[in-house]
């Protein structure tokens, strides 16, 4: 396929085929962005009727950690691009697919391998690139974990090396928290059970996501790094509940944030969008994590930018020009399921959309859990404070209810 030169017609011999591995709410928006450019999209997830399944040309349900099943599906679908949207994937199979020239892996198979677990990316950032990070230690057993906690000191944060959206993450503040934190981490890890990272606390003023795009510069036809305006966010137990753009920060802190983001994404390589998470205190910045894909806090860009993070990702992976400029201050607020039930309904939608500048994305997940993210409210405003107030008001108006 001639990246950036030619796009085909979906469901025809000329089709440009993209396979997404992971079809949640972020994957769904990427699929929509790709389809607007006439791309044929295949959505893959571990459960049926995932949000992205509902809008893709074809949908598959497989265990993506099974290398044989993954390779067989890529071969059968003859995808030109394979785009991981989650961490729990057989990355060795992706490396084989890339090496054999079967498909291009986005951003690269190596980047996917490094970022699929917190150990790979932390060692790259801190030990190879020398980026400032929180103090950390890894542990494979409970005894080693207890020693790591003693080394780092209280308070500290414990995370499985393989998890997302705060699963298995907790704060250890005293000896009484040590064993419960280990058990919680063991239950929350997706794969590679038994290995955790223990991180020391960083005293920060705020957290940001620096969305960073590696895309083809139409003038030079070489890969160039682009930056979105910084996104501020609030997390509870490692899961984002609110985000806004732009996050006010000093010129020096912004410069340092973009330097860190540029260095880590350049080391990972490839094309696409990266969500670089950073801690900021005054002019000082610490690297936290990076995801080589759209970031959940970046849902705000559906309202704040002319090209959302999903459109930027679609364009970048296809070798097309990108424009990451801010259009307006905006905010997002999460809508949780509130109950454990399949096929729920939503009340209060009219009231939510009556909030000035507000919009909604209800993800269409087939099953709700009390703390599962089922939708998001978006809002624009004259400034970030107004946008945040509107987004929270719109989110609060939506009431998930039993459909029975």
UniProtKB/Swiss-Prot annotation:
Pathway, per record: Purine metabolism; IMP biosynthesis via de novo pathway; N(2)-formyl-N(1)-(5-phospho-D-ribosyl)glycinamide from N(1)-(5-phospho-D-ribosyl)glycinamide (formate route): step 1/1
Positions that bind Mg(2+): 277, 289
Keyword Metal-binding found: yes
GO CC annotation terms, alphabetical: cytosol
The UniProt record lists the keyword ATP-binding: yes
Binding site for N(1)-(5-phospho-beta-D-ribosyl)glycinamide: 25-26, 85, 296, 365, 372-373
Reactions listed under catalytic activity: N(1)-(5-phospho-beta-D-ribosyl)glycinamide + formate + ATP = N(2)-formyl-N(1)-(5-phospho-beta-D-ribosyl)glycinamide + ADP + phosphate + H(+)
Chain coiled-coil ranges: none
InterPro entries tied to this protein: ATP-grasp (IPR011761), ATP-grasp_carboxylate-amine (IPR003135), ATP_grasp_subdomain_1 (IPR013815), PreATP-grasp_dom_sf (IPR016185), PurT (IPR005862), PurT/PurK_preATP-grasp (IPR054350), PurT_C (IPR048740), Rudment_hybrid_motif (IPR011054)
Binding site for ATP: 118, 159, 164-169, 199-202, 207
Ranges of residues in domain ATP-grasp: 123-318
PANTHER family: FORMATE-DEPENDENT PHOSPHORIBOSYLGLYCINAMIDE FORMYLTRANSFERASE (PTHR43055:SF1)
Quaternary structure note: Homodimer.
Protein name per UniProt: Formate-dependent phosphoribosylglycinamide formyltransferase
